Amino acid sequence: MARGSGAGGGGGGGGGGLELSVGVGGGGGARGGGGGEAAAAVETAAPISLGRLILSGMVAGGVQYGWALQLSLLTPYVQTLGLSHALTSFMWLCGPIAGMVVQPCVGLYSDRCTSKWGRRRPYILTGCVLICLAVVVIGFSADIGYAMGDTKEDCSVYHGSRWHAAIVYVLGFWLLDFSNNTVQGPARALMADLSGRHGPGTANSIFCSWMAMGNILGYSSGSTNNWHKWFPFLKTRACCEACANLKGAFLVAVIFLSLCLVITLIFAKEVPFKGNAALPTKSNEPAEPEGTGPLAVLKGFRNLPTGMPSVLIVTGLTWLSWFPFILYDTDWMGREIYHGDPKGTDPQIEAFNQGVRAGAFGLLLNSIVLGFSSFLIEPMCRKVGPRVVWVTSNFLVCIAMAATALISFWSLKDFHGTVQKAITADKSIKAVCLVLFAFLGVPLAVLYSVPFAVTAQLAATRGGGQGLCTGVLNISIVIPQVVIALGAGPWDELFGKGNIPAFGLASGFALIGGVAGIFLLPKISKRQFRSVSMGGGH
């Protein structure tokens, strides 16, 4: 979703005052993986038109299309293969690992790549090929598991575990996470490299616009229940309607990503990097390159600007309040709102699948609201200050997460059993849930912009080090994701499954984050504030 996804947004590219291209995935920023000092050693490319710059960033839309499907469909789907609700969160551990390991390494290598095709395009091509492979493995995991020895019963009859398919699926899921991280950083850096007279701010806006477009198309695809009707050959003995819909959506993702990739490779003309060139400083004196990677980021804790530790604390609390919903939003719709069960009776399975599709539609609404809200962040911060905007968004998330629990209880008020056994739901409740999804687009826009803008401004007042500060900020995002991935499933299991306990905990974290923000966040100049988008991603 132009969501954070979870880990793995874009790394590099950036520069130019407070304009900073940032991602969740490790060590990004104005330097990491994107144009940093090594960019100075590249011959200046010929200026390109705005239209060509726009087409050069199209690959971001293709990558985000697949990421939107991953966010909306994959947590619910893996439960149909046998993985328990309590264990599904562990599957998402790969995100922060990929962000911390892949992003810095790819950023470093792409900065110094001497290929005749340029520094960024070889990594973009490699990453996209791996993404296509990963989504095919995920989409056909049930069929692969069937061939490897899973039950030979028809999927319309057998609803038990299929462990070969589940293992294949998880491997594909992890490959997809690593592949996304391989593409995002160089793709952002490519836009910064080519921005020229248009400026990094324009390049960042184009990149984020493509990601928003990918989100909208991806969530629309995920909410569609007709792929198995349009392409009936997708259904097999191991793959029924829900699986065939997933398969169809991912096959379209391969086609769309391939189209976006080809256009980017054609229109993004890079000047090859000369590996023996010096790395100049502002004073035109040679300097040793700054450290790159997780260790350099960890060492940076010793040299943080004033106010940055407080930003890290509030950022961590803010993301702790968001990750449960990011991981389980469509699962919540399938279980608590539509009263389905991925391992239950046929009516329960159908109800669960309907809820997941409704959740994907809710994420579509969320992305649309997020896109419009993003344009309002900078004016609001200039008027009342980024601290007020950030704190207010945390309190809104607190209310929204508490509302999910209240809506869940409302949905079950006439049923005296467990979440998984209720089969009916009120249409008004479903409508309220969609409104809630859309409403959350507003604080999500704040989450994707304000913390990074505050970090950029603190670094600027210190006289530099934006890439380092952003890399350190990334740690305050990755650690909460690890905490939620390890703890959300067992926490829900402790209270009797369902998603209500995790959402209740998220509400508490949002409240603490809001209160902490009031007392800890540094005062930032309203007049000098410049909005910075992390551009979604993982």
UniProtKB/Swiss-Prot annotation:
Q: Which residues lie on this side of the membrane: Cytoplasmic?
A: 1-52, 103-123, 184-198, 269-306, 379-388, 455-470, 521-538
Signal peptide positions (record): none
Which is an annotated Pfam family here? MFS_2
Q: In which pathway does it act?
A: Glycan biosynthesis; sucrose metabolism
List the ranges whose topology is Extracellular.
74-81, 145-162, 220-247, 328-357, 410-433, 492-499
Q: Which domain of life is it from?
A: Eukaryota
The membrane topology term of the UniProt record is: Multi-pass membrane protein
List the induction conditions. Answer: By exogenous sugar supply. Down-regulated by sugar starvation and light in dark-grown seedlings.
Spell out the subcellular localization from the entry.
Answer: Cell membrane
Q: Which UniProt keywords apply?
A: Cell membrane, Membrane, Sugar transport, Symport, Transmembrane, Transmembrane helix, Transport
Q: What GO molecular functions are on record for this protein?
A: maltose:proton symporter activity; salicin transmembrane transporter activity; sucrose:proton symporter activity
Q: How does activity depend on pH?
A: Optimum pH is 5.
Membrane-traversing stretches:
53-73, 82-102, 124-144, 163-183, 199-219, 248-268, 307-327, 358-378, 389-409, 434-454, 471-491, 500-520
State the phenotype upon gene disruption.
Male sterility probably due to impaired pollen germination.
**Tissue occurrence:** Widely expressed. Highly expressed in embryo, endosperm, germinating seeds, source leaf sheaths and panicles, but at very low levels in roots. Expressed in phloem companion cells.
Function, please?
Responsible for the transport of sucrose into the cell, with the concomitant uptake of protons (symport system). Can also transport other glucosides such as maltose, salicin, helicin, and alpha-phenylglucoside. Probably required for apoplastic phloem sucrose loading in source tissues (e.g. leaves) in order to transport it to sink tissues (e.g. roots, flowers). Probably not involved in transport of sugars across the symplastic discontinuity between the endosperm and the embryo. Essential for normal pollen germination, but not for pollen maturation or starch accumulation in pollen.
UniProt lists the family membership as follows: Belongs to the glycoside-pentoside-hexuronide (GPH) cation symporter transporter (TC 2.A.2.4) family.
Question: Oligomeric state and partners?
Answer: Homodimer.
Stated name of the protein: Sucrose transport protein SUT1
Q: What is the lineage of its organism?
A: Eukaryota, Viridiplantae, Streptophyta, Embryophyta, Tracheophyta
